[in-house]
């Protein structure tokens, strides 16, 4: 049997097991007999530390609390901001009614853990009857980027100060893994920056880079060859476009450079759009692997999907990736406490495995050694959080997996009030970023326009 056919057989078994777990969760949730009696929706405007390049100085979030008639409260991040519509959809219904799965989002997982009286990761670890250990803490990669000053003129990170800034967050939080967001400058400037940062942090700190699929294949190859001596952990999808183009470029670059490539789009397919079950809905369990693409390309060394796919979908995805000998990671979007918590729970039960002491010859389905990577996170860049106790604390660059039932975190009413969204606050941030965008190409030293031609400078 060829390797892809073997993978397909293994994947069918994995999906069958995941669907059996999904059905058990659904049955246990419905049998608990809860009814949603109240829904509270909160809009929040959370500032970044500094201003995230020309993107913005704050981000808008929507949270919801779903309270049941038995006194449990499930929390969701990324909820429907239309409180009236959300209440109309869910009030009076069982939170595990399949018709409202998309409305529940993250709260679905928070509530099932609370009903089971288990931290979510432990609950899922038990349902899958895993023999591998359950992690108590998860290594995090510190996301970094060029920062313009915030509204108070503070917390800038420039090309010149970037290496000392990285040294500072390593000293403060113990990070052992740094991620460089790399669409702020033109590609050639990043060669110098990576060399400077590697010299500043030494050889013990892992460095990964992400051009956000903003480069051409030739640009990516030139960069990769010039920084090979820096021993990067990975470069994430340097080339964009249609998935077929991303996969083809990744495949070619892997043959031309020793730097590993990470992808959150490989293995295909991963997520269906739009997702009928909403965020964390595990829709990808119903999508078959693209066997033609798997036979045609090998575009990545590390598979790092988004947690939005759902815990069961990621379990399936990671098992398939490891079957093919890929490393595994987890991509980051913009997450505050509740969404960070589920990422920690997913990593805690899906990532760990027992490394063999000796080489294993011919053993079926033996996972490759050293395949688990620190997970991406924007979390270190937020000014605060809206969970009780504030931001989770880093310890040697790790975050502890929350120990309470469900997600193990709760929303803090005071912080929700302090960071409540208002048009006035949003307008101030909008004015600030518009001023930056008017001059950002000059500030960042760009020689070309965003369209690619040399800049025409008016006299």
Predicted regions located by residue number:
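A cross-domain feature marking catalytic cores of carbohydrate-active enzymes
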Residues: 142-144, 180-182, 209-213, 236-239, ...
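Right-handed parallel beta-helix/beta-solenoid
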Residues: 216, 242-243
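Shared catalytic-loop signature of beta/alpha-barrel
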Residues: 89, 93, 231, 243-398, ...
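A short, flexible N-terminal coil/short beta segment enriched in small residues
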Residues: 107, 235-236
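N-terminal capping/lid subdomain adjacent to the active-site entrance of alpha/beta enzymes
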Residues: 2-208, 212-221, 225-229, 256, ...
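Residues at the N-termini of beta-strands
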Residues: 38, 177, 234, 301-302
């Amino acid at each position: 049997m060829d390797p892809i056919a073997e993978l397909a057989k293994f994947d069918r078994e994995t999906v069958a097991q995941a669907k059996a777990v999904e059905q058990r969760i659904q049955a246990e949730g419905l049998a608990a007999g809860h009814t949603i009696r109240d829904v509270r929706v909160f809009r929040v405007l959370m500032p970044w530390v500094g201003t995230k390049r020309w993107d913005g100085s704050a981000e808008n979030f929507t949270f919801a609390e779903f309270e049941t008639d038995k006194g449990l409260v499930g929390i969701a991040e990324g909820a429907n901001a239309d409180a009236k519509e959300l209440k109309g959809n869910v009030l009076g219904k069982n939170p595990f009614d399949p018709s409202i799965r998309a409305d529940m989002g993250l709260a679905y997982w928070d509530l099932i853990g609370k009903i089971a009286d288990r931290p979510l990761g432990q609950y899922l670890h038990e349902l899958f009857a895993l023999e591998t250990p359950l992690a108590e803490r998860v290594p995090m990669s510190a996301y970094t980027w060029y920062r313009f000053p915030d509204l108070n003129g503070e917390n800038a990170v420039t090309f010149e100060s970037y290496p000392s800034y990285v040294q500072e967050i390593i000293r403060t939080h113990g990070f052992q893994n740094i991620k460089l967001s790399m669409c702020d400058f033109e590609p050639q400037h990043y060669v110098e920056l990576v060399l400077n940062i590697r010299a500043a942090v030494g050889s013990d700190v892992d460095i990964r880079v992400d051009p956000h699929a903003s480069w051409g294949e030739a640009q990516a190859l030139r960069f990769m060859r010039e920084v090979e001596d820096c021993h990067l952990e990975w470069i994430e999808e340097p080339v964009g476009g249609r998935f077929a183009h991303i996969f083809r470029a990744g495949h070619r670059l892997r043959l031309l450079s020793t730097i590993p490539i990470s992808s959150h789009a490989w293995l295909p397919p991963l997520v269906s759009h739009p997702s009928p079950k909403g965020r964390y809905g595990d829709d990808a369990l119903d999508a078959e692997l693209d066997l033609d693409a798997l036979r045609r390309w090998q575009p990545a060394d590390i598979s790092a999907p988004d947690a939005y796919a759902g815990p069961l979908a990621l379990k399936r995805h990671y098992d398939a990736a490891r079957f093919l000998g890929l490393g595994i990671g987890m991509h980051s979007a913009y997450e505050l406490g509740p969404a960070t918590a589920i990422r920690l729970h997913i990593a805690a039960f899906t990532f760990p495995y027992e490394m063999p002491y000796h080489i294993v010859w011919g053993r079926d389905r033996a996972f490759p050694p050293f395949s688990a990577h620190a997970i991406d996170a924007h979390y270190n860049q937020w000014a605060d959080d809206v969970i009780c106790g504030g931001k989770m604390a880093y310890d040697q660059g790790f975050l502890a997996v929350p120990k309470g039932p469900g997600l193990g975190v709760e929303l803090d009413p005071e912080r929700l009030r302090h960071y409540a969204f208002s048009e006035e606050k949003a307008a101030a941030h909008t004015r600030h970023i518009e001023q930056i965008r008017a001059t950002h190409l000059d500030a960042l030293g760009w020689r070309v326009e965003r369209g690619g031609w040399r800049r025409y400078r008016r006299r």
